[in-house]
């Protein structure tokens, strides 16, 4: 058994922004006046008092034509239609499941938005209601898409496609929602041997790539075969890489995760969590990403 | 999200739930305190709730609950004030919209001289003690509490001292927040 390493806490040095941002960002804190010009419309993160536009969160001001809003560093996930999310079931209610998605209110998964096993299309009956717990229990993880958003901010989810559904064996990493980049697809099969789902709400799911791609059950039956050691190592390494990227505030998307994985190959999996190794890997990743952009 | 009893959920705004506790090793002699039964802790939790309901823009979060749990690790006078200042930074870090910072400070009088930020022996001496929670940008008062009797003429001086201390605190908190913002963006 390897010995435990202990170290004293030391102030963190943040890896400074390598590329100079275009123009100084206007940073504000709550209570700061952004502008006294009444021509602007107010967006998120601001409020109006006595004809002055005042910031209500700490962050950077974003101005789009006449709309002024303040983007905070860390916020809860705000559901938008069409986003992929990964969530955990917290409650089983009468005709719906409540899903926790790192947002202000629990998201809702209606029974009618869920695919029946076997792919049948019929009206959900009372027996389906009673059998809800057989499909999804409290504590299960699912991947779903946001169908609509209620007026108070709760998102309504649906799993109406074969690629969504209950998640089987794998590793969940919880990060801040602002670090997940918006892309065309969020399901990635990485060439290193694992697959990853980047949820827009900041929940990232890493799992071993399934050999056969056809699943007629619609994602209900979980594959409980033991995962081989090589796959487990790949998944652990990916998870540590994602944690390293998050501590240095780098955006997460498939290319950045892949580069980070390749940069970390010379190190042992448990060494990636050490601060110096983390900095080194992330610097290298950042360099390669900049080279990619040209 | 609403945890606990659903029936207490307010339809148009968020509920601010505060819990205040002192660690056993916080004062001079180690004292084992009852977990939630302490009346002083309950009163200070209520004060915290009132101050933050005034500062947080709760109408943006209907039917939800915002929990603020404060635990004092070292108590040397001004416990409530330290709690308020720390909670302000915590709420700001969480990205919850607030009207302004909430800065709090105690003030008292010692033989005609106004003192700001009383320490534990000064508080225990029995003189009048004023606790002020201020929103510095507009000068609005979120909470004002006075214990022991104070002559009306002396109130102005004590209030002024507390206000000055709060504004100085606001400068320090602000500097820290901006440094952190600059570091991260």
Where are the regions a protein language model picked out?
Chain B
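Polyanion-binding surfaces on beta-sheet-dominated domains and ring/shell assemblies
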Residues: 1-185
